[in-house]
């Protein structure tokens, strides 16, 4: 049975209808620009044309992927590959990427929701209007149990491109230190996004694919504050409206993503953790020193972010033209970690692949007796096929400006290429011969 998150609102139907009415009203031979033998056309992503996304961006980078819809997770991306200029074939990055939970505990300790697995997040897909997908294509998504559409065919997935500003800026210098040539390029991104409604909240699930190989994964919460929760106690809410009569109840949004990497076509990547430590100036040295240490993560891990700590997923098979193993680095965004539940206590989890482990909590696919939350899956298994779970939290203390509608507040993270290519994939051809050299070519 699918739960109804709006249970507290039933006693206030008139108010609900009034708010609903408002809602209606990124050596020369190693450089990316070096001449390459003409390659055969890259094969399309392994899915039907209707579920295939392929976009060549203005700077020459091509992204390819498949998509499908899940009643719980919403839009799921699969077989994601990246082909920058100068690479003869696509480089597989991800086998799959999806939301794995939106955990919403309220500060009063009474209400707590799992918006994916309890509320069937995917069934709340909304139709998009052309104005919401400027310059792009709105794709039709089959949603058998669509909650907010008269049809099971929901026009709910936008793919478009968008300028992001400077990809780089280099003012070169001549030997006499006067200004030489200016190298600058404007970046372009592929955006893939959908909007899902869960009770009063609406969530924009966005993937942003830069022309330099970076992928941003974000969720934007918008819609409306829950009007049945304007009765918060002291220390658990914020006054909105006239005076202090209406206090919106504070709550958290703990968003999880599940990433199954497939770098260079292999799921057998490895995980590495890096920590840097700053020490006081040593005798005879004028400044502090900083040393970075690598730790190989060979077994499952519940990881906590720290200053100067980061992780990367390293390809088991692929190397760039410099002979360095390809990898992607995890770049978390701002977070407010929620310690109230075991599975929300950590920032990232690395678990051994198990087909039934699909959601960070409330996982419905595993057999009886199997733990249902991601923290319980970290039990010492050796990592040969790691799955990455990222947790980004946001503590929402409302403000007057949150009504009405509520401005989008974003939370998310990125994965950035580290040694995927031998140089910046957007390097101009005049600088292609500077790999590992200091000469700016100016």
Task: Label each PLM-derived region with a short phrase.
Residues 1-37:
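Secretory targeting and sorting signals
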Residues 39-206, 210-214, 224-233, 240-442:
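Extended effector regions of multi-domain proteins
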């Amino acid at each position: 049975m699918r739960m109804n998150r709006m249970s507290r609102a039933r006693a206030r139907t008139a108010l609900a209808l009034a708010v609903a009415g408002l809602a209606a009203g990124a050596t020369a031979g190693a450089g990316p620009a070096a001449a390459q033998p003409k390659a055969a056309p890259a094969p399309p992503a392994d899915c039907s044309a209707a579920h295939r996304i392929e976009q060549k961006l203005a700077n020459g980078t091509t992204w390819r992927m498949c998509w499908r819809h899940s009643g719980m997770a919403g839009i799921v991306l699969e077989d994601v590959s990246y082909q920058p200029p100068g690479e003869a074939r696509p480089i597989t990055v991800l086998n799959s990427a999806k939301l794995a939970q939106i955990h919403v505990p309220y500060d009063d300790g009474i209400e707590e929701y799992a918006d994916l697995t309890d509320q069937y997040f995917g069934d709340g897909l909304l139709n998009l209007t052309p104005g919401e997908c400027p310059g792009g294509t709105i794709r039709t998504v089959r949603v058998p149990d669509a909650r907010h559409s008269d049809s099971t065919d929901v026009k709910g997935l936008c793919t478009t491109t968008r300028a992001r500003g400077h990809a780089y800026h280099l003012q070169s210098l001549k030997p006499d230190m006067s200004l030489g040539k200016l190298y600058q390029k404007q970046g372009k991104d592929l955006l893939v996004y959908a909007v899902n409604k869960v009770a009063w909240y609406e969530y924009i699930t966005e993937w942003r694919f830069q022309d330099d190989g970076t992928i941003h994964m974000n969720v934007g919460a918008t819609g409306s504050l829950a009007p049945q929760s304007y009765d918060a106690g002291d220390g658990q809410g914020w006054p909105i409206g006239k005076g202090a009569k209406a206090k919106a109840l504070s709550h958290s949004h703990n968003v999880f993503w599940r990433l199954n990497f497939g770098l260079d076509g292999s799921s057998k990547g490895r995980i590495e953790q890096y920590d840097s430590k700053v020490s006081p100036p040593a005798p005879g040295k004028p400044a502090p020193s900083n040393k970075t240490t690598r730790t190989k993560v060979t077994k499952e891990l519940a990881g906590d972010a720290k200053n100067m700590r980061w992780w990367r997923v390293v390809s088991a098979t692929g190397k760039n033209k410099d002979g360095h193993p390809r990898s992607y680095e995890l770049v978390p965004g701002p977070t407010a970690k929620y310690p109230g539940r075991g599975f929300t206590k950590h920032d990232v989890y690395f678990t051994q692949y198990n087909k039934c482990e699909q959601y960070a909590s409330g996982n419905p696919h595993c057999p009886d007796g199997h733990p249902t939350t991601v923290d319980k899956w970290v039990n010492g298994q050796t990592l040969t096929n790691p799955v990455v779970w990222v947790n980004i939290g946001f503590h929402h203390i409302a403000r007057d400006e949150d009504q009405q509608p509520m401005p989008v507040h974003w939370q998310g993270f990125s994965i950035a290429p580290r040694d995927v290519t031998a140089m910046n994939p957007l390097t101009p051809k005049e600088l292609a011969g500077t790999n590992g050299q200091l000469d700016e070519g100016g």
